[in-house]
Amino acid sequence: MHESQKKRWYVLQAFSGFESRVAQSIREHVKLNQMEDLFGEVMVPSQEVVEIRGGQRRKSEYKFFPGYVLIQMKMTDSTWHLIRNVPKVLGFIGGKSDKPSPISDKEVEIIINRLRKIGNKPRPKTLFEPGEMIRVNDGPFADFNGVVEEVDYEKSRLKVSVSIFGRSTPVELDFRQVEKN
């Protein structure tokens, strides 16, 4: 393998569910072997999501590419061997097993822009849209059906038109009080 002058982006396949641990392990191996000058960023593109389970708000992580880790590095024999010896790394994606192909700068730019756009704001796991039918499962309107009029993700609340005695009545409900129909 020849040494290229600039760091390029490569895609690693890792055991699914271990992407973050693999990324951390790579960072530790790089530091331990004093190869920081040959490596750049190690990324697991993901977004924090908020879901409501059992009435409790829980944060979890949604990975855009489950089972994959992006790594910026100069490809040399020593860097290739370092990565291949990290536990739970299955190998590089693209090219031949002994000579992986980097992904294009344009592809990386698209991923990074997408991550920048979503920022650090957690998004709800369940997304509601105006006009969507829902069923109320809690509170005074339990077991009624309704139509979503407005969605407020900041407050996790919905404005819903519920049909009561044949008349459409607007009510405000928490995400926890409704389910998709």
From Swiss-Prot:
Function: Participates in transcription elongation, termination and antitermination. In the absence of Rho, increases the rate of transcription elongation by the RNA polymerase (RNAP), probably by partially suppressing pausing. In the presence of Rho, modulates most Rho-dependent termination events by interacting with the RNAP to render the complex more susceptible to the termination activity of Rho. May be required to overcome a kinetic limitation of Rho to function at certain terminators. Also involved in ribosomal RNA transcriptional antitermination.
Alphabetized UniProt keyword annotations: Transcription, Transcription antitermination, Transcription regulation, Transcription termination
Family in the record: Belongs to the NusG family.
PANTHER family in alphabetical order: RHO-INTERACTING TRANSCRIPTION TERMINATION FACTOR NUSG (PTHR30265), TRANSCRIPTION TERMINATION_ANTITERMINATION PROTEIN NUSG (PTHR30265:SF2)
Any single GO BP term: DNA-templated transcription termination
HAMAP family assigned to the protein according to its UniProt record, in alphabetical order: NusG
Source organism of this protein record: Buchnera aphidicola subsp. Acyrthosiphon pisum (strain APS)
InterPro entries assigned to the protein according to its UniProt record, in alphabetical order: KOW (IPR005824), NGN (IPR047050), NGN-like_dom (IPR006645), NGN_dom_sf (IPR036735), NusG-like (IPR043425), Rib_uL2_dom2 (IPR014722), Transcrpt_antiterm_NusG (IPR001062), Transcrpt_antiterm_NusG_bac_CS (IPR015869)
KOW domain mapped to chain residues: 130-161
Protein name per Swiss-Prot or TrEMBL: Transcription termination/antitermination protein NusG
Record PROSITE patterns: NUSG
Residue runs in coiled coils: none
